[in-house]
Amino acid sequence: MKLNNYYVYGLKIKSEIEIEEFVKLDNIADEDVVTISYSTMSDDIKEKIKEGIRINLSNNKIWFHINNIATYCVSNGNKVEVELCDNADMKLMKIYVMCSCLGFIMLQRKMVAIHGGVIEMDNKAVIFTGDRGAGKSTLTTALREKGYKFLSDDVASTKIDKVPYVMPGFPYQKLCESAMDNFGYNKESCTSFISDKEVKYIVDAKDKFVSEPKQLSLIIKLVVDDVEEVTIEELRGSEKLNNIIENIYRGEYIKYLGGMNPKYFKQCIDIAKNIRFFKIIRPANQFTVDTQIELIERELIGVKEVVV
């Protein structure tokens, strides 16, 4: 069986499933590898799916079922198994591998991954986080279009090496239809898929992709509120730490995996100690991306001080 070699989010991956969006490598060392393969789920899992159960989590094993797409089993921080449904949408099947499955792998490995896009600014990584619909991908796309380099679209995988670093993801972004229209992208030339009843498009960002880790300097949380103009405020102390924890990718599942252990919590503290955290509040139903970028460039880029 021919395997595809990838390096994504700091993970060495050998995959039976070809994922075109990932950067392919000729060779990869065999130790500490994540394998991705097609498989057949156990009778126990199949029985639970028949009973209507769609996800099951334990310390070292997570499986979940997506109707008409596939069943996925993620185990021991090093294995992803996929059983396809009949006539499955292969593009959507791979999206779950790229996002949720690798997110669960990182949780099992106690790697802190923050839900957000990552842009290189002033030679450092800046994470843009926030709730769904806050405008993360729109803002990171606008920054990329302005010439800033790009590390990751939706997941910021971190590593502590005295200070926190963000590991590169893959050189594509997922954009909704309105963002495609705002940036004048050709929808016909992009792969599309349906996610939560919304059409998403996969946009090539290879020309601005950064393939090496970058030191993390800022996290910016985007918030939509009933306000008239874009404002910015800094979070400090425990509020900063709490917001990091609240925005962990797939963090809602940590309590089902034995809770947050001391090592994982210490990584969150180390991130908080070494970065600044800002909240940008923007009005709903207005396209304020240019204003947000102006504010970020004027107020935040080049700021050296870290306030704990």
Kindly label every feature range from the protein language model.
Residues M1-D89, M93, E294-V308:
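Long, basic/Gly/Ser/Thr-rich N-terminal segments
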Residues K2-K24, D122, V126-T129, K146-L151, ...:
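Glycine-rich, often acidic-flanked micro-motifs
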Residues R109-N123:
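Phosphate-binding P-loop
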Residues I95-V112:
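N-terminal pre-Walker A segment at the start of P-loop NTPase domains
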Residues G133:
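Walker A (P-loop) phosphate-binding loop of P-loop NTPases
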Residues L139-T140:
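Post-Walker A alpha-helix
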Residues K136:
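Conserved lysine of the Walker
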Residues L143:
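Aromatic pocket-lining residues of Rossmann-like dinucleotide-binding sites
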